[in-house]
C-alpha cells in the first residue's frame, strides 16, 4: 500500500479540504476478483485534471465527502474506499476520459440492485467538478452475482413451459395503447393469438385507468388466450402488466393472474423501481409465472453519450433483479440502437460468460456463474420486411414483437398475425437450409408471399417504410 493513499488513524486528524486524488487515485492498485469494477465516461469541468475527476467519482460514490472528517479515523478507510485505478483518454472526444473504479464488495448489500445503484450512481452524478458523467459498464463479480435469484425461470425453462423450440418467439403489442374497453382489448388479443402469434402484450402505460380497469382486462385477456389455445393447439400468453402504484397492489395483480392460470405477467422495471421488480421476480419464480420486462424511461437515462447510464448496465441490473424478457431495441426499427452495441448487451443478457470486447462496448469480462438468461425482445417500428434481418441479428433465443406491424394489416389483426408467422417460418426454414438472410432476405419474403395472400398484402403496405436516422449513441472510434 502506498503511504500516499493509505489512511491511518494514528497520524491524527487534520481538518480541512484536500484533493481527492491524494486518497482515491491509486494507479498501482491490483483489482481483486471480488471487486465490483466500473467504467465511467468522465467530462471534467475546465481546469479539473482527469486524475482528480476520476478520484472524485471514486470518493463520492463510496466513502468520501467534500472535507476531511474526524470519523475517518474510526474505520479502515483503505478497506472500504473506492479506488480510481486507471484513466484513459477517449480518442476523438475533447476532454472525455474513461475512469476505471474498483469498489470493495463489502460496500454493497447482498441481493440488492437498489443499494448497488444508490452508491455507484447516486449523488456523484450531480457533482459540480464534473461537466458530465456516464456509467458505461460494470463488472459484477461472481461472489456478488451469487447473492441474486435473477430471472424467475430463464430461457430454457420458458421454452419447456411453452413447448416451442428452434425459432424466435412472436409477439404483438395491442394498439391503440390507451382507450380500448376491456372487451375490445380482449378481442384484439384473441385475433392475434389465433392468427399464429405466441404472445400479445399490454403496452407499458396500460395499468388500471378509467377506460379499462386492470381486473376487467385480465379477465378478458385470459378468456382470449384460452380460446386461442384450444383453436390452435399451441400454448399462448399475454403479458398482463402488473405495474401499480404500490408494491402491494402490484403483487395483488400478479396473484390474480396466477389464479386465472395465465403463464406470464409484466412489469415496467425502471418506472416501477428495482425493489418492486425484485419482489415481483421472486413471486413469479415461487408461483410459476414468467415475467416480461418493459424498459420504459430507459432513454431518459441511457441515450446521451456523455451523461447517464448505458443500457448495457441497466440490462445487467435487470438480469440480477429478475426478468425473463426485456426490450432491447431492434437495430432496424424506429428506436435507437446501433448493431454492435445492441448485440453486445444482448449477449450479456443471454450468455453465461461474456469476454471483454471494446468493439461491442463491453469493458469487462462478465461471468454470470449460471444465473439464468433473459430473452431480448425486439420491438418498435418493425414489419414483415424486417423479419430476415431480425432473425439473423437476434437468432432463435429472442422475441420479435410487431405491434403496428400486426394490427396495421389492411385485412385485420388475425391476417396480420398470419403474415408475421409465415414470414418468420420462411426465414427460419431458409436459414436452416444455409441461405444468407442478410443477402437474400427480400427474395425469401417475396417467395413466401406467393403462397400467403396475408403476407403479400403486408408486403405491399410496408414496402417503402424505413427509419433512416443516425444513432445518437455510437461506439468510440
Curated annotation (Swiss-Prot):
EC class of the enzyme, as a word: lyase
Protein keywords: Acetylation, Calvin cycle, Carbon dioxide fixation, Chloroplast, Disulfide bond, Lyase, Magnesium, Metal-binding, Methylation, Monooxygenase, Oxidoreductase, Photorespiration, Photosynthesis, Plastid
EC number(s) on file: 4.1.1.39
CDD domains attached to this UniProt entry: RuBisCO_large_I (cd08212)
Catalytic reactions of this protein: 2 (2R)-3-phosphoglycerate + 2 H(+) = D-ribulose 1,5-bisphosphate + CO2 + H2O; D-ribulose 1,5-bisphosphate + O2 = 2-phosphoglycolate + (2R)-3-phosphoglycerate + 2 H(+)
Main location: plastid
PTM comment text: The disulfide bond which can form in the large chain dimeric partners within the hexadecamer appears to be associated with oxidative stress and protein turnover.
Propeptide: 1-2
Domain of life: Eukaryota
Site feature location: Transition state stabilizer: 334
GO annotation, cellular component aspect: chloroplast
Residues the record lists as binding Mg(2+): 201, 203-204
Modified residues (N6-carboxylysine): 201
Gene Ontology MF terms in the entry: magnesium ion binding; monooxygenase activity; ribulose-bisphosphate carboxylase activity
BP GO annotations: photorespiration; reductive pentose-phosphate cycle
Subcellular location: Plastid, Chloroplast
Positions carrying N-acetylproline: 3
Binding site for substrate: 123, 173, 177, 295, 327, 379
Signal peptide coordinates: none
Cited Pfam families: RuBisCO_large (PF00016), RuBisCO_large_N (PF02788)
Cofactor note: Binds 1 Mg(2+) ion per subunit.
Note: The basic functional RuBisCO is composed of a large chain homodimer in a 'head-to-tail' conformation. In form I RuBisCO this homodimer is arranged in a barrel-like tetramer with the small subunits forming a tetrameric 'cap' on each end of the 'barrel'.
Family: Belongs to the RuBisCO large chain family. Type I subfamily.
Subunit structure: Heterohexadecamer of 8 large chains and 8 small chains; disulfide-linked. The disulfide link is formed within the large subunit homodimers.
Name of the protein in question: Ribulose bisphosphate carboxylase large chain
Gene (name only): rbcL
Amino acid at each position: 500500500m502506498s503511504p500516499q493513499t493509505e489512511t491511518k488513524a494514528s497520524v491524527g486528524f487534520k481538518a480541512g479540504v484536500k484533493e481527492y486524488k491524494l486518497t482515491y487515485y491509486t494507479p498501482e492498485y491490483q483489482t481483486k476478483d471480488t471487486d465490483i469494477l466500473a467504467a465511467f465516461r468522465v467530462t471534467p469541468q475546465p481546469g479539473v485534471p482527469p486524475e482528480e475527476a476520476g478520484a472524485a467519482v471514486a470518493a463520492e460514490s463510496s466513502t468520501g465527502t467534500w472535507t476531511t472528517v474526524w470519523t475517518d479515523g474510526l474505520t479502515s478507510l483503505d478497506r472500504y474506499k473506492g479506488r480510481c485505478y486507471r484513466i484513459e483518454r477517449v480518442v476523438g472526444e475533447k476532454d472525455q476520459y474513461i475512469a476505471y473504479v474498483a469498489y470493495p464488495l463489502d460496500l454493497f448489500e447482498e441481493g440488492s440492485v437498489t443499494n448497488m445503484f444508490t452508491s455507484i450512481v447516486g449523488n456523484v452524478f450531480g457533482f459540480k467538478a464534473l461537466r458530465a458523467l456516464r456509467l458505461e459498464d460494470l463488472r459484477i463479480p461472481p461472489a456478488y452475482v451469487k447473492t441474486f435469484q435473477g430471472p424467475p425461470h430463464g430461457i430454457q425453462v420458458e421454452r419447456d413451459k411453452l413447448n416451442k423450440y428452434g425459432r424466435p418467439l412472436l409477439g404483438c403489442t395491442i394498439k391503440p395503447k390507451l382507450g380500448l374497453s376491456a372487451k375490445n382489448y380482449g378481442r384484439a388479443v384473441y385475433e392475434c393469438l389465433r392468427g399464429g402469434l405466441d404472445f400479445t402484450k399490454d403496452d407499458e402505460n396500460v395499468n388500471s385507468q378509467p377506460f379499462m380497469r386492470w381486473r376487467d382486462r385480465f379477465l378478458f385477456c385470459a378468456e382470449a388466450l384460452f380460446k386461442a389455445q384450444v383453436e390452435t393447439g399451441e400454448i399462448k400468453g399475454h403479458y398482463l402488466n402488473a405495474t401499480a402504484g404500490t408494491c402491494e397492489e402490484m403483487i395483488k395483480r400478479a396473484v390474480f393472474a396466477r389464479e386465472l392460470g395465465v403463464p406470464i405477467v409484466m412489469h415496467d422495471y425502471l418506472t416501477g423501481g428495482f425493489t418492486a421488480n425484485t419482489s415481483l421476480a421472486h413471486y413469479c419464480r415461487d408461483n410459476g409465472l414468467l415475467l416480461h420486462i418493459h424498459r420504459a424511461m430507459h432513454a431518459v437515462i441511457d441515450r446521451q453519450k456523455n451523461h447517464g447510464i448505458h443500457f448495457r448496465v441497466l440490462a445487467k441490473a435487470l438480469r440480477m433483479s429478475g426478468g425473463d424478457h426485456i426490450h432491447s431495441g431492434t437495430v432496424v426499427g424506429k428506436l435507437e440502437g446501433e448493431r454492435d452495441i445492441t448485440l453486445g448487451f444482448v449477449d450479456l443478457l443471454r450468455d453465461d460468460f461474456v469476454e471483454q470486447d471494446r468493439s461491442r462496448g463491453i469493458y469487462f469480462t462478465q461471468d454470470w456463474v449460471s444465473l439464468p438468461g433473459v430473452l431480448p425482445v425486439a420491438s418498435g417500428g418493425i414489419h414483415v420486411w424486417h423479419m430476415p434481418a431480425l432473425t439473423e441479428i437476434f437468432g432463435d433465443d429472442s422475441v420479435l414483437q410487431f405491434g403496428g406491424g400486426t394490427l396495421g394489416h389492411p385485412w385485420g389483426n388475425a391476417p396480420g398475425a398470419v403474415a408475421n408467422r409465415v414470414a418468420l417460418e420462411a426465414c427460419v426454414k431458409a436459414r436452416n437450409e444455409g441461405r444468407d438472410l442478410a443477402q437474400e432476405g427480400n427474395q425469401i419474403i417475396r417467395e413466401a408471399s406467393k403462397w400467403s395472400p396475408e403476407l403479400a398484402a403486408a408486403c405491399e403496405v410496408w414496402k417503402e417504410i424505413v427509419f433512416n436516422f443516425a444513432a445518437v449513441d455510437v461506439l468510440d472510434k
